[in-house]
Amino acid sequence: MSYNLCDKARQLEPYDPVEGTYRVRLDANESFLLPTVSDREAMADIVQGVAFNRYPDPLAHDLCAAFGKLYGVDPALVTAGNGSDELISVIFSTFLHKGDTVLTVAPDFSMYRFYTSITENPCLTLQKDADMRIDVDEVIATIREKGVRLFIFSNPCNPTSVGLDRDSVRRIIRETDALIVLDEAYMDFWDQSLLDEVAAYDNLIILRTCSKMLGMAALRCGFAVANATLTGILRAAKSPYNVNSVTQSLAALVLSNPAYMAEYKPLLLASRTMLWEGFAALEQEGLVERVYPTCTNFVFVKTDRAMAIQEFLKDRGIIIRRFGEHYLRITAGTQAENREVLDVIAFMLRKEKEDRHA
């Protein structure tokens, strides 16, 4: 006898992070900044005090309180998770019946569709326009006409870096009866959050993370914020001890220090501006087709040389992310990293241009 895998398991397509060791990593939208020496010393002291023989606080009270204080939301409306991915999985498995339809947009974070394959829910996908904008009227009409139960999207968007303004998001929430899962992983880089309004809606869950602006990707710490009813359901549905004690303590330390973000945010935004302006210059020179507006810590570039550029950079120890044959996503790094990636790409494309006209 042998175990026969079900079709769902056979057809799973896992998330495909870039593997290998590279000198410059601009592929995962991580922060290029590390905590200061004093911050690291404080973190070390906290780790020394962790009771490793005890299970963590199941509701991460101190962590949720720190998040609530920083962002001005009631901690009772916050659910902590082992990264936002865990919370997406909990949301899908909890709020969807078998057969319920999920709506996504494209391009967007690929894991949304992955989780629909796990829960075996039909998934509709609407394409964004040439400017990588969501057609709000189309979204609302599709939810109504197709009986969509859950609509999930990132704002600002990963991978396009384009954001949808607050009023447009409000329309989707107010004019439909679907559960709206609003992934604000990159909202620390923009100013259109709906966190301050979340308690007013019975069909909204907002996701946030410590991995981007806060630079704590290694901790795997995310949050779901919703009204009291939805939060009670999320807390009941998640695993009992889902966020380990080290993550709870260290993330709470960072969230409790407003100076941490106040110091790092201008540096990250300056890096993003430098990188975007560099690609805008390449666009003006006719070397890339388009660089999209950015509300995140990365830039999204359209070029028919995407595959060649990625390989050219790899050969020089630099890794970026490619989407299909025509798009690149480049994380903002240090000034030196930004300058190097811009110089290498410009060198390659100018050389090709010269060769064509030789």
Language model features: what each stretch is:
Residues 269, 282-316, 332:
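Conserved PLP-binding catalytic core of the aspartate aminotransferase-like
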